[in-house]
Amino acid sequence: MATKVITGKVRASFVHIFEPQSVNGSEPKYSCSFIIPKSDTETIGKIKAAIEEAKQNGVSKWGGKTPANLKLPLRDGDIERPDDPAYADAFFVNANSREKPGVVDRRRIPITDPLMVYSGCYVRASVTFYPFNTNGNRGIACGLQNVQLWCDGEPLNGRVRAEDEFDALDDVDDEDFLD
């Protein structure tokens, strides 16, 4: 049993929502990291409640009790990524899925262009939290369901859009260009 949460405005990072990606030879999955400002207490509260519910649902998978070394999906960017300013004063969750997530714009029109949703843009996300017990690893996983583009943001890869980097040029006569 999974518990669903729809986030508020979060920042997308490591966006792989249009094509699945394999990590270290594992099964290819769709994935995205969602950076949640610590000031968004509503989204953080919903995620914490969903994790607690998933823990209760997982007791049967974990031999009747919650393990002490349980892996949890809500992580603190200040602790785990102290050198990355995008994660400062924020929590994050890494969500993934074997199935392609739905991706829509603000008006719920499907987005198929992978350049529209990128690491650094702002989105809302539909994610689920569920218990797992695989190969001795126990914890709560975060499943990727759907993504809604909220607005553009500064790309996290450091790349600048061409239209932001260059000034418009006047029309040039080809003969003048060669001089």
Each model region followed by its residue ranges:
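OB-fold/S1-family single-stranded nucleic acid-binding modules
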Residues: N135-E154
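Exposed beta-sheet edge/beta-hairpin loop segments within beta-rich domains
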Residues: R107-V123, Y130-I140
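Short, basic/aromatic beta-hairpin or loop at an interaction surface
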Residues: F92-R106
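OB-fold ssDNA-binding interfaces and closely related basic DNA-contact patches used
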Residues: M1-F92
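Extended Gly/Ser/Thr-rich low-complexity repeat segments
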Residues: K46-K55, G102-P110, P114-V117
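Beta-strand elements of well-folded, non-transmembrane domains
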Residues: I36-K38, F129-P131, C151
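Acidic, gly/ser/pro-rich intrinsically disordered tails
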Residues: M1-K4, E154-D179
